[in-house]
Amino acid sequence: MTATTPCLWARAPGARKLGIPGETRGNVFFGIDYLVDPSSVAIGQSVAVIGAGNVAMDVARAALRQGARNVTIYARSKHVSASSDEVEFDQLDGAELVYGKAVQEIDDNGPVLRTAIFDEEGAVVGYEDELDHVSCDTVVIAASQQAKDKLVLTTDALVANDRGLLEGGARTA
């Protein structure tokens, strides 16, 4: 006799909002939504991508393939969560990756960023006071996702963390 293990698949198709001023402007999109149908967005020539995961890398390549000439990916830390292959493909396609930039708001011209201060181990310990104003046609926020699945949101036995991801327990296989 073999034991069976139930498996629950819950998708996280919802964009995670940053809660910053300007993220609802007409030229600001969320990565997961943009990737559903990139051709439905007039992306422009210059694109700022906020985030450094695989979705951010996919957004950058989609924007370049859609005709954007300047695509810059902004990462808060010195590390990215995207796979090294994704990063390499983006750079080969012409995207620029800028480390140590945290978005504070999005104004009429584009994202307003602060530069990170790193300790000896490369961890962010603070931010410089000076703000960097980036001018671009389009901003795409690709800084994580959250659960948008009704099952996860309405079932008490399923516990999600602050990012909307399911928490595992002792009985989780």
Where are these regions (language model features)?
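Conserved beta-strand-loop-beta-strand element in the redox core of flavoprotein oxidoreductases
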Residues: 1-7, 25, 107-133
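Short acidic, glycine/proline-enriched helix-loop-strand junctions
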Residues: 23-27, 42, 80-96
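Glycine/threonine-rich flexible loop motifs
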Residues: 17-22, 126, 150-155
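Rossmann-like dinucleotide/flavin-binding elements
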Residues: 14, 33-84, 132-133, 138, ...
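Feature captures the FAD/FMN-dependent oxidoreductase FAD-binding
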Residues: 1-20, 104-112, 138-140, 146-148
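Short gly/ser/thr-rich secondary-structure transition/capping motifs
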Residues: 27-34, 119-126, 161-166
